[in-house]
């Protein structure tokens, strides 16, 4: 769940329990920062970043297992994730 100061709530439908691993939050922060650095408004960067982050974890869990996931796997899956998510 992503909440904004004005009270809006956004629910991210991607991701899985295997992503609760060391460094996963750092990857999420990097994705959000990368989007924000492209002058995408911060709330949109946060919503998109959370979706992309979770989708990357979902790709890994489909190809491997949730229990083996490490933060580097999320980064390695970003090119495939972006191909599938972005128009």
Predicted regions and their residues:
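Small-residue (G/A/S/T)-rich helix-start motifs and N-terminal tracts that mark the onset
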Residues: 1-87
């Amino acid at each position: 769940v992503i909440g904004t100061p004005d009270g809006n709530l956004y629910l991210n439908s991607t991701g899985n329990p295997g992503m609760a691993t060391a460094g996963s939050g750092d990857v999420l922060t990097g994705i959000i920062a990368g989007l924000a650095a492209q002058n995408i408004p911060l709330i949109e960067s946060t919503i998109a970043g959370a979706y992309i982050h979770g989708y990357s974890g979902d790709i890994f869990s489909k190809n491997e297992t949730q229990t083996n996931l490490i933060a580097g796997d999320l980064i390695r899956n970003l090119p495939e994730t972006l191909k599938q998510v972005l128009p």
